[in-house]
């Protein structure tokens, strides 16, 4: 309907083009996910099926949007980092965030049975999303460090909380009151002395979250026998707060 008398309504649209030459982070979060996990009988404090499904949905997002150089996930959230030179949807914030969150949600629903089997999906989940800009490499590393530190803090608290509720028979309010004002050392001591749980021995995924990135792997051609290095998307549960990770995989932030 080009050049029609109604075309003026386009002038009401607000421009939302993101700044050039900065890292774009699209962070998605589950909306009312506590209710969703309760309705679908998620194990507490961590449900391996749910975490694996989140990782799978995020992996498919990374395949669909190759401008994503690294992604980090914990619980019901995922952060996708798009390279500085990304020109996806001409860097329109609303288009980028809505496309990524809708694709993530569709993959979550589509692949539900792969991870939950005959456990029925009673209603689809909802995720919100936003774009945040980070100008420097140090900023983006600090952002990812913040999310991984948050993973540890939340998981330590939840591990203690559910141990008190499920193993010690505390009510939710009693468990909250007992944990109020405690620090990491106290929580670790509680887990070990009262529940024989060594927090450091829990799966790394629970404590460190999930990192998706392109990792160099050696592949051998079956016909020629020649081996060459290729980059493949992998999901790992590693420390990204220390510089060791970034020194081992410098190409991640070199993808500008």
Curated annotation (Swiss-Prot):
Entry GO MF terms: 3'-5' RNA polymerase activity; GTP binding; magnesium ion binding; tRNA guanylyltransferase activity
Enzyme class: transferase
Gene Ontology CC terms: cytoplasm; cytosol
E.C. number(s) listed in UniProt: 2.7.7.79
Swiss-Prot/TrEMBL cofactor(s): Mg(2+)
Keyword tRNA processing: yes
Residues holding GTP: 29-34, 75-76
Location in or out of the cell: Cytoplasm
UniProt cofactor note: Binds 2 magnesium ions per subunit.
Keywords assigned by UniProt, alphabetized: Cytoplasm, GTP-binding, Magnesium, Metal-binding, Nucleotide-binding, Nucleotidyltransferase, Transferase, tRNA processing
Highest taxon of source: Eukaryota
GO BP term, pick one: tRNA 5'-end processing
A matching Pfam family: Thg1C
Binding-site list for Mg(2+) 2: 29, 76
Chain sites annotated for binding Mg(2+) 1: 29-30, 76
InterPro entries: Thg1_C_dom, tRNAHis_GuaTrfase_cat, tRNAHis_GuaTrfase_Thg1, tRNAHis_GuaTrfase_Thg1_sf
Annotated catalysed reactions: a 5'-end ribonucleotide-tRNA(His) + GTP + ATP + H2O = a 5'-end phospho-guanosine-ribonucleotide-tRNA(His) + AMP + 2 diphosphate + H(+)
Family: Belongs to the tRNA(His) guanylyltransferase family.
Functional summary from the UniProt entry: Adds a GMP to the 5'-end of tRNA(His) after transcription and RNase P cleavage.
PANTHER family per UniProt: TRNA(HIS) GUANYLYLTRANSFERASE-RELATED
Protein name: Probable tRNA(His) guanylyltransferase
Protein source organism: Dictyostelium discoideum (Social amoeba)
Phylogenetic classification of the source organism: Eukaryota, Amoebozoa, Evosea, Eumycetozoa, Dictyostelia
């Amino acid at each position: 309907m080009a050049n029609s008398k109604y075309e003026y309504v386009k002038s009401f649209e607000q421009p939302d083009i993101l700044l050039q030459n900065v890292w774009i982070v699209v962070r998605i979060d589950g909306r009312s996910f506590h209710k969703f996990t309760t309705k679908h009988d998620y194990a507490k404090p961590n449900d391996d099926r749910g975490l694996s499904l989140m990782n799978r949905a995020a992996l498919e997002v990374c395949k669909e949007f190759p401008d994503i150089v690294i992604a980090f996930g914990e619980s019901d959230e995922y952060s996708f980092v798009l390279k500085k030179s990304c020109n996806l949807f001409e860097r329109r914030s609303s288009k980028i965030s809505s496309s990524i969150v809708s694709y993530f949600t569709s993959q979550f629903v589509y692949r539900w049975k792969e991870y939950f089997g005959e456990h029925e999906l009673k209603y689809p989940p909802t995720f919100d999303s936003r774009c945040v800009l980070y100008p420097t490499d140090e900023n983006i590393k600090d952002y990812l460090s913040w999310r991984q530190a948050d993973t540890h803090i939340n998981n330590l608290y939840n591990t203690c909380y559910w141990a008190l509720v499920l193993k010690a028979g505390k009510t939710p309010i009693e468990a909250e009151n007992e944990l109020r004002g405690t620090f990491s050392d106290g929580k670790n001591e509680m887990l070990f002395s009262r529940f024989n749980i060594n927090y450091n021995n829990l799966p790394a995924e629970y404590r460190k979250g999930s990192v998706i990135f392109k990792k160099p792997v050696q592949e051998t051609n079956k016909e020629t026998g020649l081996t060459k290095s290729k980059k493949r998307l992998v999901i790992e549960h590693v420390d990204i707060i220390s510089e060791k990770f970034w020194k081992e995989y410098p190409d991640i932030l070199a993808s500008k």
